[in-house]
Amino acid sequence: MKIVLQKAIALSGFCSRRKAEVLIENNEIKINGQIAKKGDKVDLKKDKIEIRGKKLSSQPEAIYLMLNKPRGYTCTNRRFPNEKNIFDLLPNKERLFAVGRLDKDSRGLVLLTNNGDLAFKLSHPSFEHKKEYQVKLKEKVEKPKLISEKFIKGIDIGENDGIVKAVGAEYLQNNIFIITLSEGKKRQIRRMFNYFKLTILDLKRISLSGIFLGNLEEGKWRNLNKKEIEYLLNK
């Protein structure tokens, strides 16, 4: 079956659909020896697709998994000396895209897949997928209701990012909040609490796009089940 070229490339796990479109525009892709054009359709099993002179392998088996990221690990595909990386925790050495990256000081749920198209859809801010975090603060919270209301109304976090909002902000007890975002500026939650001069001791993502971390042990991973995969693919 023929499908649009950029979708075929994303399904192969080479890159996202958006990146594939850039490669097509730059004349870096050939189909059966001919320069590809936007809108071309291909059959991954029959057509020879070359990207920058290298043959694209046919669609691999789809991989969808979750990881409970520990604090101190980075989420990038680039490796740096003397730095721990989440891919060190995974047995699969195939190229995977991390969905919903967490900064080095945060922990919790990260989704990983070789489906570049899905990774783009779940990561791009325009799709506004919800992400839920459990936040433990160092200082005693005196006015939790005021903080929750301000989070939802909007806070100017500066650095040209302007006003950002939380979809949900619920105070539990013992200086713990549950914060829900549909956007993701750099270190957004930390900067929002810093507005109130509050310091985060622990930041843990507990759900992403309707997929929940549950009781998965820290530093461990598991494959998503059929129901979870279908839910993500149909979003």
Which stretches of residues belong to each language-model region?
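Basic, flexible Lys/Arg- and Gly-enriched helix-loop patches that mediate nucleic-acid binding at interfaces
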Residues: 2-235
